[in-house]
Amino acid sequence: MASDSSFPGASSNVAEYSVSEISGALKRTVEDTFGHVRVRGEISGYRGPHSSGHAYFALKDDRARLEAVIWRGSMSRLRFRPEEGMEVIATGKLTTYPGSSKYQIVIEQMEPAGAGALMALLEERKQRLAAEGLFDPTLKQLLPFMPRVIGVVTSPTGAVIRDIIHRISDRYPLRVIVWPVRVQGDTCGPEVATAVNGFNTLPDDGPIPRPDVLIVARGGGSLEDLWGFNDEIVVRAVAASHIPVISAVGHETDWTLIDLAADMRAPTPTGAAEMAVPVKADLQASLASQSARLSSAMSRFFDQKRQAHRAAARAMPSADQLLALPRRRFDEAASRLTRALFVNTQKKRVHFDGHARQLSPRLLQRRLVELERGVTMLGQRLPRALEAFLRERRTAFTHRANRLSPEPILRRTRLTGSTLEQLDRRRDQAVRLLIERVKRRSQELDRLMRTLSYESVLERGFAVVFDAQGKPVKQAAAVSPGDALSVRFRDGDVGVVARAGLTIPDPTKGQ
């Protein structure tokens, strides 16, 4: 039999480790050696921040991939929002998980890998959103000339809000509503988008008035500082806003995607306030100037009309001149009227005399004879006409009397009476049937009640057990030894005391 010393390595001086020991040693070596490293790579598989506030992703390059995690505390200190595909430089420490032989970097700080990477990402996003029409100039809204309420989305503690309020107060004091947001960091974009959407959802007649124009403002800063205003959700919220939006982010040389989506871009927050409201003094001066111009124009208008009236009055002839011709025509017509009346009277007199000569007694006598003859003829025709009329009326009366015979009415009356008798008989029969049915149903219910009644159960030899409170006992498990019970039989109650060790007989053994 071969000795154990014959196996290779049996007498070697190499230390022997368990899996846990070698994994722990490897963990200590990695964490000691790479306790503080800077890693450059592209963000891949970004997931976060979760409800816990942590974010998980990987850093990769062309040949390798390193898992990464940012805990909640470090995540809140980032000056930008990590995004898929962004090239960054991460500072942290490497650690391993002995249970799964995996390692990752726990990131404590992270920054974009130079402005070039951010500019490339910004240009790609700009082209994509522009293709969707979010920057279309035809969709821009006009700013109201005289807004009543202005909504401002900015930090409530910075110099920006003070400059805006001060500028508005100097130009035209009105109501300003501030929606406080963070203007830098990972939560900047979501908070700005929420503020714009929140202002748009305010009702016109609510306790908080709906603004007529919005100002999204922030002071100057680096590309990383302003990165939250390049967030896609901010651009979409501003483009979808029904309230005109003025973008005032950074200095005049700075630009962000919100500037392209807004309805107006201001070089500074103070400039945004100047765009939003006019100067009250300028309005008053303009109003006074226009009022003076209106008064001057009205004076000139009335002077011109007054001069035209005077010129027309001078050109108009006098009353005597105007009435001279009509007066002469009236006098001529009056003289002609006198002559015409005389001539007409003479004509009428001659015509009357001619008719008077025609009215001789013999002519009147002849006319009277003709009238008497006509009356006589009508008197002879009248009896025959009257008899024919009466005969026609009598025939019509007889015809109508025949139509009004009582026989059809009597026949209809008899038919109606027969129908009423049938209905009476059917009603009486239905009432009797209903009464019998109700009586039978009542008898059945009475029998059922007697069968299921409490007394019927006792009559059949059963008994009911009550506890000390007089409540029925439904289960043996509800009774404890020594409990005072009452057993009710058909003819009375018996008091008993429960004992221990009783068994429940099997009802099937006696069969």
From Swiss-Prot:
One of its GO terms (cellular component) is cytoplasm. GO terms for molecular function: exodeoxyribonuclease VII activity; nucleic acid binding. Pfam families: Exonuc_VII_L, tRNA_anti_2. Its EC number is 3.1.11.6. InterPro entries: Exonuc_VII_L, Exonuc_VII_lsu_C, OB-fold_nuc-bd_dom. It is found in: Cytoplasm. Bidirectionally degrades single-stranded DNA into large acid-insoluble oligonucleotides, which are then degraded further into small acid-soluble oligonucleotides. This is Exodeoxyribonuclease 7 large subunit. The gene is xseA.
